[in-house]
Amino acid sequence: MSNLNGFIVVDKPKGPTSHQIDSWIRDITGEPRVGHIGTLDPGVSGVLVMALGKATKLIDIVHRESKEYVSVLRTYDKYDHDSIKSVFKEFTGKIYQIPPVRSAVSRELRIREIYNLELLEMDEKFVLFKVCCESGTYIRTLCTDIGYVLGSGGQMAELRRTRTGPFDESMCHTLQEVSDAFKLKSMGNEKLFKNIFIPMDFIFIKYPKVIVKETALKNIAHGSDIYPAGIHAITGSPKKGDVVAVYTEKNELVATGTMMVNADEIYDLKVIDIDNVLIETGDNDGKDSLVRKDNRWKDIPVQKPERKLHGNLQGSQEWKDTGNRGNPKRGGTGSKGFSSGFRKRKAKR
């Protein structure tokens, strides 16, 4: 069984489905755990990130990040640059969308955000533009809606994805290149393989990190949550609800998680840096005593405070007398005698 844990960015051609690419990568690499991040329709090309091995657990994290596309909009009438740019401004920000009829999700009204909409080129009725958007935005629907606002109608003619989260077009490799890399790897030449294979922690370059102590790793491996006692440090000032990457003190990625509180609320992460321990319990002539940590004073006991007795009964003889009166075994009168004796002393006060 293969032990590949990372990502490969495939330049998906038009024609095959995203699931067919999964199958081909599975055959090429020998890794049974393969999944893609963000489905591309058969007629769409571009960045298709393949997760292998343990990286399949990180698919949802990458899928939530923004995506970038280059598309061609075909309108049914001619427009000038100013008209197109004016409509693009209306579609920048949060918009309403209903997924197209041919989609893998239910056709319900939803809100998606367009971060940037840039006009690149125009030729007759064809408009080339670039869009950076929230995950789950349908570019086909966006083109149709832009056509309605223009007045003549329009539809998507071409679409290519150029970025998914931190993976951009410059990191793409064809299926043939991926196949060649693994064939050369099996022959001992890993140069091309190292060029196309991306480790898991690449996606966390801009994420806040939580560095845990070695003593916490066993519990984390069993799925336990992380508590302040197991944290060595936090970088990036994450807020409640933020996704964080969990690293060891040796900079090894071991888990991901969600912050339950703000980083500045973990007040007991490291409050006091201890220089000297002053409360060690030692042994001095058979009696427990507090001993100073400093070796120069190692054998010098610290005087314990005098034990205070109940009420005003400070003298040992007085305590014994009172105890005898209250203890039938010592010739006293029981609890009643002790109570009455205590009330008498209380009255004298």
From Swiss-Prot:
Pfam families for the chain: PUA (PF01472), TruB_C_2 (PF16198), TruB_N (PF01509)
Catalytic activity: uridine(55) in tRNA = pseudouridine(55) in tRNA
InterPro entries given in the database record: PsdUridine_synth_cat_dom_sf (IPR020103), PsdUridine_synth_N (IPR002501), PUA (IPR002478), PUA-like_sf (IPR015947), PUA_sf (IPR036974), tRNA_PsdUridine_synth_B_fam (IPR004802), TruB_arch (IPR026326), TruB_C (IPR032819)
Any one GO MF annotation of this record: tRNA pseudouridine(55) synthase activity
Signal peptide start and end residues: none
Keywords for the protein's UniProt record, in alphabetical order: Isomerase, tRNA processing
Region (Disordered), start-end ranges: 300-349
EC nos: 5.4.99.25
PROSITE patterns registered for this protein in UniProt: PUA
Residues annotated as catalytic: D41 (nucleophile)
Function statement: Could be responsible for synthesis of pseudouridine from uracil-55 in the psi GC loop of transfer RNAs.
Protein's recorded name: Probable tRNA pseudouridine synthase B
Organism, scientific name: Picrophilus torridus (strain ATCC 700027 / DSM 9790 / JCM 10055 / NBRC 100828 / KAW 2/3)
Lineage: Archaea, Methanobacteriati, Thermoplasmatota, Thermoplasmata, Thermoplasmatales
